[in-house]
């Protein structure tokens, strides 16, 4: 891959992927921005009830044949899908970076973790054998078999547009379910490319569908009786809402809300190792991940000055700019609203008595002068 991907492209429309085909939909759209430039990259369709119904019908109709497909045949498709993901890794990572903003190294790491789940799904046939117990009772043999649920739905966040969907759909589909993915409308393109690659690998039409949309699309998915299971990763308020709605409608639900994490550095800690861990946890992917240190780092008075000094030195060495430039260590936050929110946190901390040791608000990056924040460090005793 070249040192910098060309991010200057014509604005285009992003639709859906239903029944093995790209589906155009220009009725209601939302802008998709390149966070590194602040420019509109595309317009993504926001599916209405009729489009959602088509995706559900496609998945529902495909379920009977797919659940009857031999596990070994499914595995062959998954091996091919894994191969295509690796062959198209550069293209997938470029889409992640152009729409999310994270640097290419972070995008590659994300994709790699997702492919690990696909690899695990390649061995799913060993997990579908059920159980048999001879003589469980007098003249009684006991056996059980594992059966797919039906049409499953995955609703995923913006911060890991490849990895989090791959937590969900490979396992569901390998087990004989069909699937509808509703990715974040902020960075939808990588999900559509994955759907195309899956079908290229031999997945029958309708087994994997992608519907772009907002709350209206989610509500339509949660209300339809043909949906058997829902998986969600995102903010806690939405996780709670989705759990209530989906369980009320009789669906199996797993809903993972946001995390609030802190770190504690003990007096006998390896300071250099601790600082390296803090750098990755606090600033990796611009801190836009659930396992980021989003609350506080607790340090005793004896170590605080040493840790802050080492952090400050490492921060000064980092290069910040568009994620498409492989020489950069950190890219932009995904939206201007996200940048403003983090800036407000800094101002709130100062108002509450914190000392601003490193102020990241004055960073200027050519081409998007107001779109970037540098790392910041606040200290409070």
List PLM regions with ranges:
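Rossmann-like NAD(P) dinucleotide-binding subdomain of oxidoreductase/dehydrogenase enzymes
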Residues: 130-275, 327
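Generic secondary-structure signature for well-ordered alpha-helical cores
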Residues: 61-68, 83-90, 101, 116, ...
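Residue-level signal for inorganic ion chemistry
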Residues: 38, 74, 96, 118, ...
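ALDH superfamily catalytic-core signature
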Residues: 237-381
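Terminal low-complexity tails and localization/encapsulation signals of metabolic enzymes
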Residues: 1-43, 76, 80, 130-156, ...
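Hydrophobic face of alpha-helices
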Residues: 56, 75-82, 93, 111, ...
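Conserved residues at the C-terminal ends of beta-strands
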Residues: 124, 155, 214, 233, ...
């Amino acid at each position: 891959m070249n040192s910098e991907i060309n991010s200057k492209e014509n604005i285009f429309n992003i639709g859906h992927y239903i029944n093995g085909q790209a589906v155009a939909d220009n009725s209601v759209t939302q802008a998709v921005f390149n966070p590194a430039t602040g420019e509109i990259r595309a317009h993504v369709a926001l599916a209405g009830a009729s489009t959602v119904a088509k995706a559900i019908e496609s998945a529902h109709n495909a379920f009977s044949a797919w659940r009857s497909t031999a596990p070994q045949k499914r595995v062959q498709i998954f091996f091919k899908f894994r191969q295509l993901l690796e062959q198209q890794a550069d293209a997938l990572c470029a889409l992640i970076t152009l729409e999310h903003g994270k640097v290419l190294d972070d995008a590659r790491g994300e994709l790699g973790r997702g492919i690990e789940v696909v690899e695990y799904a390649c061995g799913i046939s060993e997990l579908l054998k059920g159980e048999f117990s001879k003589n469980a009772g007098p003249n009684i043999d006991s056996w059980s078999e594992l059966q797919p649920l039906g049409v499953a739905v995955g609703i995923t966040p913006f911060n890991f547009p490849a990895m989090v969907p791959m937590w969900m759909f490979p396992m569901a589909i390998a087990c004989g379910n069909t699937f509808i993915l509703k990715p974040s409308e902020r960075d939808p393109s990588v999900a559509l490319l994955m759907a195309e690659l899956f079908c290229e690998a031999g997945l029958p039409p309708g087994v994997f569908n992608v519907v772009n949309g907002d709350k209206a699309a989610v509500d339509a998915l949660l209300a339809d009786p043909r949906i058997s299971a829902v998986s969600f990763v995102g903010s806690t308020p939405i996780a709670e809402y989705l759990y209530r709605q989906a369980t009320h409608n009789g669906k199996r639900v797993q809903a993972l809300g946001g995390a609030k994490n802190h770190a504690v550095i003990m007096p006998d800690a390896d300071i250099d190792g601790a600082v390296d861990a803090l750098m990755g946890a606090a600033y990796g992917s611009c801190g836009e991940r659930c396992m980021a240190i989003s609350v506080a780092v607790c340090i005793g008075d004896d170590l605080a000055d040493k840790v802050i000094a080492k952090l400050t030195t490492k921060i000064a060495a980092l290069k910040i700019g568009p994620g498409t430039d492989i020489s950069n260590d950190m890219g932009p936050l995904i939206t201007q609203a996200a940048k403003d929110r983090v800036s407000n946190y800094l101002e709130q901390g100062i108002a509450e008595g914190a000392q601003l040791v490193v102020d990241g608000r004055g960073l200027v990056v050519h081409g998007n002068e107001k779109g970037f924040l540098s790392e910041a460090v606040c200290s409070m005793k």
